[in-house]
Regions:
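A residue-level marker of the well-folded mature domains of exported/periplasmic proteins
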Residues: 20-384
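Positively charged n-region of N-terminal signal peptides that target proteins for export
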Residues: 1-9
């Protein structure tokens, strides 16, 4: 009996040892857990990214100009395309053959609206003619960016900003350059109340925003510059006149009766008849043309000419003005920057299409003279 009990106890001990051994061998099993990790996160999700990219549309932005035939608009188009390339958007630049073809421009814009653009850049020939289109843009949430003359008088709320020249700032450049002319400065320093010096601005009207802005910009800056050399009086047109008795420097604003070339020339002749005239700023291409007619197409300004000592500056460009600058008959001229007008118009349109808040951009202006007129950047800006 004792032997039987001993045998049973031995069997129990063996079974216990076997069970303990099995548990000890199973302990490392958790180390296998990391092997399951790759199964926990399928790799299929990232494959959706290319599909999302395929769904993303390239922004389409029509750029509708007031014209297309002049070099000015070609420079605007070049700037527009440069911005489109930089921002990765598609544009279509177009304009009517003439800046009098309002109906043609409206038709062009309507065709582009049918393509559901994400934004529209517009230099309107007639704001009232595109009123319905502007209302449609406002209703559909298509932001409109004005450029050059923009979309003046818009009431739809569709126009979010404008890329254009600040005419006051641009014309002020001419006044600053007059202040750098040694001969003119010497005349201002030597002037007296009995023998004043006269600096004139010749404008074709006192109504249009661009011409008025340039006239104001020149007068204000010229007063600032001239005040360093004497007492200044602004005379001529009532809109700008601020007459001061005993002035040594007179800034005269001459506005022609009409914008016709003959009337501008008559105003130029009236200025040229004043013996104390020392300098003239012509505020646009039209007044430059009229003034040049009064000085034998510029030859009277040449060395040995009747008005060889007269300091003259213009605005914009054109073949006749460029020739006067290149010959040195003009001290220089101010040109707008049509390349930047186009570039900034598209840049603003892209930002507005992406829901960003935008505001007006001054596209700047450049001074050109006989020394830099053929520089690569200036030559792009000064059209014929």
């Amino acid at each position: 009996m004792k032997k039987l009990i001993a045998l049973l106890l031995a069997l129990v001990m063996v079974v216990g040892l076997v069970a303990c051994g099995a548990k000890e061998e199973a302990a490392p099993a958790p180390e296998a857990a990391p092997e399951a990790a790759p199964e926990a996160a399928p790799e299929a999700a990232p494959e959706a990214a290319p599909e999302a990219e395929a769904e993303a549309e390239t922004l389409y932005i029509p750029v509708m100009a007031k014209g297309f035939q002049h070099q000015f608009w070609q420079a605007v188009a070049a700037g527009s395309q440069a911005a489109a390339d930089e921002y990765g958007v598609e544009i279509y630049f177009d304009g009517p053959a003439s800046e009098t073809e309002i109906a043609a421009q409206v038709n062009m814009i309507e065709q582009e609206m049918a393509k559901n653009p994400k934004a529209l850049a517009l230099a309107a020939l007639d704001t009232s003619a595109v009123a319905d289109i502007l209302d449609e843009c406002a209703e559909k949430g298509i932001p409109v960016i004005g450029f050059d003359s923009g979309v003046p008088g818009d009431t739809s709320g569709a126009v979010k900003a404008t890329a254009c020249t600040n005419n006051e700032n641009a014309a002020a450049i001419a006044a600053e350059k007059f202040g750098e002319n040694a001969d003119l400065v010497a005349k201002m320093q030597a002037a007296t109340a009995d023998a004043p010096v006269r600096i004139a601005v010749l404008s074709q009207d006192a109504v249009s925003a661009s011409v008025c802005g340039r006239t104001t910009g020149f007068v204000n800056k010229m007063v600032e510059v001239a005040s360093a050399y004497g007492t200044v009086s602004v005379e001529g047109h009532d809109k700008w006149a601020n007459k001061v008795d005993g002035a040594t420097i007179i800034i005269e604003v001459a506005v022609s009766a009409t914008t016709e070339a003959v009337d501008v020339q008559n105003s130029a002749n009236a200025l040229l008849a004043k013996a104390d005239l020392a300098a003239v700023f012509c505020s646009n291409e039209g007044t430059v043309t009229g003034f040049l007619s009064a000085v034998s197409d510029g030859e009277d300004l040449a060395d040995g000419g009747k008005y060889e000592d007269l300091v003259v500056a213009g605005f914009d460009a054109g073949a006749a003005q460029k020739n006067a600058v290149r010959q040195g008959w003009f001290y220089g001229s101010v040109t707008q920057d049509p390349y930047q007008i186009g570039y900034q118009a598209v840049a603003l349109a892209v930002a507005a299409a992406n829901g960003e808040t935008v505001s007006d951009v001054d596209t700047g202006a450049q001074w050109y003279n006989a020394e830099n007129i053929d520089d690569e950047m200036i030559s792009l800006l000064v059209y014929d």
